Amino acid sequence: METERALQQLELLQKKLYAYHCADSSLYLDAVTTAPSGTAEGRGVAMSILAGESQKLMTCPETKALLDELSARADELDLVHRREVEELRRSCEQLTRIPAEEYMAYKELCNRADDVWHKAKAQDDFALFCPVLQELVDYNRRFAGYYDASKAPYDALLNEYERGVDMEKLDRFFETLREGLVPLIRKIGEKPQIDDSFLHQEYPAAQQKAFADYLMEVMGLDRRHCGLGETEHPFTLEFNNKDVRITTNYDEHNVASSMYSVLHEGGHALYELGIRDDLQYTCLAGGVSMGVHESQSRFYENLIGRSRPFVEAIYPKMQAFFPQQLDGVSAEQFYRAVNKAQPSLIRIEADELTYCLHVMVRYEIEKQLIGGTLEARDVPAVWAKLYKEYLGVEVPNDREGCLQDSHWSGGSFGYFPSYALGSAYGAQMLRRMEQDVDVWGAAARGDLAPITGWLREKVHQYGGLMEPADVVKNACGDFSPEDYIQYLTRKYTELYGL
C-alpha cells in the first residue's frame, strides 16, 4: 500500500473514532443536564453498543494491518503521523486484550452507576451505591491486567491518566507535600481565623449565573465555542477545539463555589480550545494527560483566580452583581476570605493549602480498593478515619463524605492524583511564566490574554503530540514539587502573618 493512501485511511479511521466519541459524549452530556431521571436504561444500551462498535473498529484486522503498514514506514512519516500511529497501536493492543462482551458490559455499568450515584448522593444512601461501586472496582482490577499485566493493578490504572506515574513516585510526591505543608497548616491552626461569613449569605442563583457569564468573558472564552451548563458535579466535555462544554453548580449560600468552579472548568476549556487545528479529529486532539489538564484548570482557579491582583481587578464588577451581599466588604477582605485555610469536608471547595490532603485520602483508598485489601462496603469507615487523621474533621454523612465526587461512578480509578500533580505542575509553570510575561500586571488589569497566550504556546497547542513529562519539561523544566511548596508557603505566611 502506498504511504499516501495509507495516511488517507488513517485519517478516515480517526474520524470514525471521533464520531463514536461525539455520540457517546452527547449521550453523557444529555444524561447529566436535561435527561429525565428514568431514562438511564435505554441510554446505557446505546452507549454500550457505541463502545462495542468503537472497539470493533479499533481492533479489526484491517485496522491492525493499516497500523502495521504505517509502523513499517515510520521513517516516511512526519512527527504528527508517527505519534498518531504510536497512540493508535497502543489503544489497539489494549482493546484487543479486553473481551468485547466485557468491554460493552462495563460501559453499560458506568452509565448505570452514574445514575445510581446521583440518586445515592441525593438520598445520602451509600448502601444504594455500594453494589455498583464494588462491580466497578472488580472490573477495574481486571482491566488493569488487560492494560499492562507487568504492572501492579493500580499502577496500570494510574498510567492511563498520567503516563509514567506509579505508586512509588506518587508516594514520594505526597510525602514531600506532607513534609512541606502539614507544619504550615498546623501553624495556621494556631492563628486567629479569617472571617468569610459574608460569602455564605444568600446569593440568588440567577445573579450567580450572570456573574459566571462575566467570568467566562474575562477568561476570554468565546461563547460561540464554549457552553456553560449546570450539573450536580462540575465538569468539562470537549468535542473539538471549536466545541467545548463546561458546567458548574450554584450554591445559593456559598458564592465562591460556583465562582471558582467556573474558573477551574474554564481552564480546562481553554486548554482544549487552544489545541492546534491540524490535530483535530485525531487521537492527539485532546489534552495529553489529566495531570497536565488539571494544571491548567487549577492555574486559572487558584494561581490566578485567588491572587490579590485578579481579585482586585474583578471585585468592583462582582460588587455590582451582588450589591447588598458585598456592601461594605473590601477587595482585601474578599481576597482573604477566598484564601482562608481551614480543613474541611468537600474537596472541590477546599482551600489551596489543604486541598492535596483531600486528594491523598482518595489516593490511599484507591490503592487499597484496586490492590484488593479494601472492599466497597468498608469505604465509608475508611474515608471517615482518613479524614479525621489527615484533616482533623469529622465526616457527618456519606453525601459530604465518600459520595461527594462523581469519579468512581464513571470508573475513573487513578484520576484523583492528577489534581495534586496538576497543582504542582501549575506552580512550576507560573514561576517560568513570570520570566516571560508581566503576569501580575495583566491580572491586575483583568486581562488574561498574555497569560493564556503563554500557556497556549507552551502547553495547549501540542495536545497529545508529546508525552506528559515532555510537555511539562518543555514549559518549565524537569518536574519538581518544590515550586508548589514554596508558592504556598510564601502566600500563606503573608496571609496569616506567620
Locations of the language-model features?
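Contiguous, non-catalytic segments that form substrate-binding/exosite surfaces or channel walls
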Residues: Y106-V255
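Divalent metal-coordination and catalytic microenvironments
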Residues: L10, D148, H264, S297, ...
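Post-HExxH zinc-binding segment in Zn-dependent metallohydrolases
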Residues: G286-D327
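A well-structured
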Residues: M1-R163, G464-E467, E482, T489-L498
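Secondary-structure capping and boundary motifs in well-ordered enzyme cores
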Residues: G42, E102-A105, V132, P204, ...
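All-alpha helical catalytic cores of prenyl diphosphate-utilizing isoprenoid enzymes
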Residues: F174, R178, A205-K209, L215, ...
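C-terminal, non-catalytic "cap/extension" segments appended to globular domains
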Residues: E2-A6, C22-S25, G38, G42, ...
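Active-site recognition of the HExxH zinc-binding catalytic motif
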Residues: L10, S257-R276, E294-R298
